[in-house]
UniProtKB/Swiss-Prot annotation:
Disulfide bonds join C35-C115, C68-C73, C121-C325, C201-C233. The lineage of its organism: Eukaryota, Viridiplantae, Streptophyta, Embryophyta, Tracheophyta. The record marks R62 as: Transition state stabilizer. Belongs to the peroxidase family. Classical plant (class III) peroxidase subfamily. It catalyses: 2 a phenolic donor + H2O2 = 2 a phenolic radical donor + 2 H2O. Glycans are attached at N81, N210, N238. GO terms for biological process: hydrogen peroxide catabolic process; response to oxidative stress. This is Peroxidase C2. Its cofactor is Ca(2+); heme b. Binds 2 calcium ions per subunit. Binds 1 heme b (iron(II)-protoporphyrin IX) group per subunit. Its EC number is 1.11.1.7.
């Protein structure tokens, strides 16, 4: 009995050690020796993309956010459809709005040329998000790396987990808490990613014309801002027209998003909820603090980004390092494998 009990305790301790080591493998210095070029490659790729697409930085940050909220930061959002699973690209929160996949493809091809079979797509997306923020004038931070890529996508989970533009504050809190982001500062700081980028008219039409099926606009919307938005998104107009999240500094990563919320000029309902909802007693002080001090916002954003980046990472021998971010690696037949390096380089 004693021996059996000891073995059970030993097994439990080994399990805890394995979990601890798995998380410990995420490190800002993970690629210092194996692929230090990855950071410059990411920066240069985004710089090139920005010349023709000023909103690409915001789009890449959003991709990383939507990746991490579904099964952790595992690059599952980058996978295309297969016969085995539906892609997350088809989920409600991504279809016809998630973008930047081609930029990640270009980045990955350059990284594979410089450091073959070394940098995961999950890490690359996290690094690209950080570089996007920096290039838009936001804060810098060291990205903990060492993630592995998932072997499948999770469309149904994406539909369940991703916040929507019309989410109430309580729904937002629940969705953040469900993935492990349980601090009010996580929600408020990460929502600040809407300080740059654009949104489609289709996601704000109810706010402008028929809020909660009332036949009237959202009463929390500033009247002058409502008039501006109605000109950009007229009733029966083109629902794909793009509107800036932040009219003040639409391409700059700053704290104006929170200034807008204080003035009831949040573009989508889920943003304005942080300041105007009856449930906002724990988020209003943070909105005020970030509006009054950009440094406070930047510090909180960096902390929240690192916390989000640490959500359920696949590390060690879990998952794989994809050679193409859109598809899982081909598995060789045992009889065909003579030199694994030759095989891998031919995929």
């Amino acid at each position: 009995m004693h021996s059996s009990s000891s073995l059970i305790k030993l097994g439990f301790l080994l399990l805890l050690l394995n979990v601890s080591l798995s998380h410990a493998q995420l490190s800002p210095s993970f690629y210092d020796k194996t692929c230090p070029q990855v950071f410059d490659i990411a920066t240069n790729t985004i710089k090139t993309a920005l010349r023709s697409d000023p909103r690409i930085a915001a789009s890449i940050l959003r991709l990383h956010f939507h990746d991490c909220f579904v099964n952790g930061c595992d690059a599952s959002i980058l996978l295309d459809n297969t016969t085995s699973f539906r892609t997350e690209k088809d989920a409600f929160g991504n279809a016809r709005s998630a973008r930047g996949f081609d930029v990640i493809d270009t980045m990955k091809a350059a990284v594979e040329k410089a450091c073959p079979k070394t940098v995961s797509c999950a890490d690359l997306l996290a690094i690209a998000a950080q570089k996007s923020v920096v290039l838009a004038g936001g804060p810098s931070w060291k990205v903990p790396s060492g993630r592995r890529d998932s072997l499948r996508g999770f469309m149904d989970l994406a539909n369940d987990n991703l916040p929507g533009p019309s989410s109430t504050l309580q729904v937002l809190k629940d969705k953040f808490r469900n993935v492990g982001l349980d601090r009010p500062s996580d929600l408020v700081a990460l929502s600040g990613g809407h300080t740059f980028g654009k949104n489609q008219c289709q996601f704000i039409m109810d706010r402008l014309y028929n809020f909660s099926n009332s036949g009237k606009p959202d009463p929390t919307l500033d009247k002058s801002y409502l008039s501006t938005l109605r000109k950009q998104c007229p009733r029966n107009g083109n629902l794909s027209v793009l509107v800036d999240f932040d009219l003040r500094t639409p391409t700059i990563f700053d704290n104006k998003y929170y200034v807008n919320l204080k003035e009831n000029k949040g573009l989508i309902q889920s943003d304005q909820e942080l300041f105007s909802s009856p449930d906002a007693s724990d988020t209003i002080p943070l909105v005020r603090a970030y509006a009054d001090g950009q440094g406070k916002f930047f510090d909180a954003f960096v902390e929240a980004m690192i916390r989000m980046g640490n959500l359920s990472p696949s590390t060690g021998k879990q998952g794989e390092i994809r050679l193409n971010c859109r598809v899982v690696n081909s598995k060789p037949k045992i009889m065909d494998v003579v030199d694994t390096n030759d095989f891998a380089s031919s995929i």
